[in-house]
Amino acid sequence: MRKLALVPIQFYRYAISPLMANHCRFFPSCSCYAYEAIENHGIWRGGWLAVRRLGRCHPWNDGGFDPVPPAPSSRTSSIAE
């Protein structure tokens, strides 16, 4: 299911995005961010992170470096210690 959610993002990145000028104010670009967020966090959480990022990508935002937050680590390692 996760791979199916990534197909439209890949299509945009490789078929549509090269035809348009670079408009994203962030690094990584919004499409790269969305792909990485869904890949690392799953469809629901990653999709929510991508929607929030797209909401911040507008002319009144300065942009800059905005990486995908790391996936939460498992709690079992801290419990075992």
Curated annotation (Swiss-Prot):
The keyword Membrane applies. It is a peripheral membrane protein. Keywords: Cell inner membrane, Cell membrane, Membrane. It is found in: Cell inner membrane. Its main location: membrane. SMART domains: Haemolytic. Residues 61-81 are annotated as: Disordered. GO terms for cellular component: plasma membrane. It comes from the Bacteria. This is Putative membrane protein insertion efficiency factor.
